[in-house]
Amino acid sequence: MLIAFLVGGAGGYAIRKYLAEAKIASAEKAAATIIEEAKKEAEARKREAVLEAKDEVHRMRNEVERESRERRNELQRLERRLLQKEETLERKSETLERKEASLHRQEEAIQRTREEVEKIRQQQVSELERISGLTTEAARNILLKNVEEEIRHETAMLIKQVEAEAKEEAEKRAREIITYAIQHCAADYVAEATVSVVNLPNDEMKGRIIGREGRNIRALETLTGVDLIIDDTPEAVILSCFDPIRREIARIALEKLIADGRIHPARIEEMVEKARRELDTKIREEGEQATFEVGIHGLHPELVRLLGKLKYRTSYGQNVLKHSLEVAFLAGAMAAELGVDVLVAKRAGLLHDIGKAVDFEVEGPHVNLGVELAKKYRESPEVIHAIEAHHGDVEPKSIEAGLVQAADAISAARPGARRETLEAYIKRLEKLEEIANSFSGVEKSYAIQAGREVRILVKPDKIDDAMAVRLARDIVKTIEQTMEYPGQIKVVVIRETRAVDYAK
């Protein structure tokens, strides 16, 4: 059994060895075949590459030869053209030489003719001098003088005619441009008044506004500087003040108090302060709306705010913001007709009265104040010059400045636009407040009762009771010396001391 197992194992081993050797031999034979085929393929590809390279060299040689032939042909054509040009130039040169010779002969003939003519002319001049008794120079002077006088007369007449025609045409064109601008600027306008009316829900509200012993109405008048007129007008209170900003603050505060229902001095003070903040926001919105209407962008925010303040400023009864918008539209329309810078004309027209937004706070003419503001907020030199020249204080040096000046005059001269008496009244009230504010220790002052009373709030830490009496007397004396007014003016100096503490 064991022997059979050993014999079987030896036989299996021999068979496996034989099969392995057969596989190895087969693999070696296959490898040799593959190598042989690879060599044959490489040799074939090598021959193909050599043939392709030879073909490419042959093709390139043919291409070079073809280009060389073309260049030789081109050079031959150029040589033929050059030869033709040389022949043409030679023929032209010969022709020119013949013409030069002919011209030379003609010049000699002309020169001989000139000499003969000059000789004849000299003989004629000598004969004329002998007959007239005048030398050539004297005759020339007489002739030149006569011609000069005639030319001067004709020139003067021509200049006069041209000037008249130019003036007539300029006036006609100016009328057309102004008419066009006015037609395209239809401004609705109502003259500003110095009173505002606040409607009441009922007449009982009048008593609450007046308050116990008049403390509410007195507090409201003191805080706003506005006259409250409570009369027989049903369900209405009239606010009177020459300053539209103060009047608007009082109107907003009073309407809020009426809506709230709680009316007492502390609440009045709170509502007045709230109305001031609300009006500041409204002023900025008005300025932004004005720039949007005109189509002007890039204005400094402070200039936008000052534009909004112009809505609450009047000039001879004309609202200054509406007037500025009107001037901007008119100047822009005329600039478009003349073909100059429309944006500069509009911008200058909108800002030309910007100084009026601060002229009641800062001393000086509104033109100078406007120029300073425009320089401060970096407006262009063209706009600054137009502001400076719009009242004729400075000669306009640009077309835009002249257009702003014309538009300002058109807007102001429009029938019904301004009222002289109202402006004089407002200036008188402003002068009263200016006199009061000029004294040291004065915090603020209000001209009320149509200028018949001035209320002055003083700083209690600087003005005591005795000084308040003397201050009233000094202000009265200054008013009497510097102003003319009908009737009498009541001067009231108010000194208020508050002590505030908090229980904790």
Swiss-Prot record:
GO terms for biological process: mRNA catabolic process. GO terms for cellular component: plasma membrane. CDD domains: HDc, KH-I_RNaseY. Residues 194-279 form the KH domain. Residues 320-413 form the HD domain. InterPro entries: HD/PDEase_dom, HD_domain, HDIG_dom, KH_dom, KH_dom_type_1, KH_dom_type_1_sf, Ribonuclease_Y, RNase_Y_N. Pfam families: HD (PF01966), KH_1 (PF00013), RNase_Y_N (PF12072). It is an enzyme of class 3 (hydrolase). Endoribonuclease that initiates mRNA decay. Belongs to the RNase Y family. This is Ribonuclease Y. The lineage of its organism: Bacteria, Bacillati, Bacillota, Clostridia, Moorellales.
